[in-house]
Amino acid sequence: MQTNIYLVTDNRTPKRKDCSYGYLMEAVDMGNRIGTAKNWRGCEEDRYGALLRALVEASGRMKPNHAGTSTVLIVTDCQPLASGVLSLKRWEQDGWIRSKGRPVKRKEEWKRVADALRGYQIAAQVKGVDFYEDLLRKGEYDGER
């Protein structure tokens, strides 16, 4: 089984401002969508922070995976966030210190993500997600694409 998590925000800048963020989740088993979840809400945050909030909320909905056979695919248009997702295990092993010896920024949020996704095989993909943002903003997502 695979869970796809699409992370979106309407904040296109690195500046903190009033914005909205959200996620779409879909559970897929053997090519069939078997469940969906979504959320869209406001905050005051920069782009990265808004997307990280979406990731924290979405990953918090995941059930524990003790078998280690399920995959989670995080889809975002933010390369730094995708890199963070792929660095989770290393950061945790290194005491939440990045490769150049600096502490991981927003460590508490990343710890929550790591705890929620423990046991899953994690992948990240950088691609446009505007389609999902539009659906969330309009409240039209019903699990169909």
Task: Report residues per predicted region.
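Loop-to-helix element that buttresses phosphate recognition and phosphoryl-transfer chemistry
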Residues: 50, 54
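Accessory terminal regions of nucleic-acid processing enzymes
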Residues: 142-145
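RNase H-like nuclease fold core
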Residues: 1-49, 60-61
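RNase H catalytic domain
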Residues: 59-138
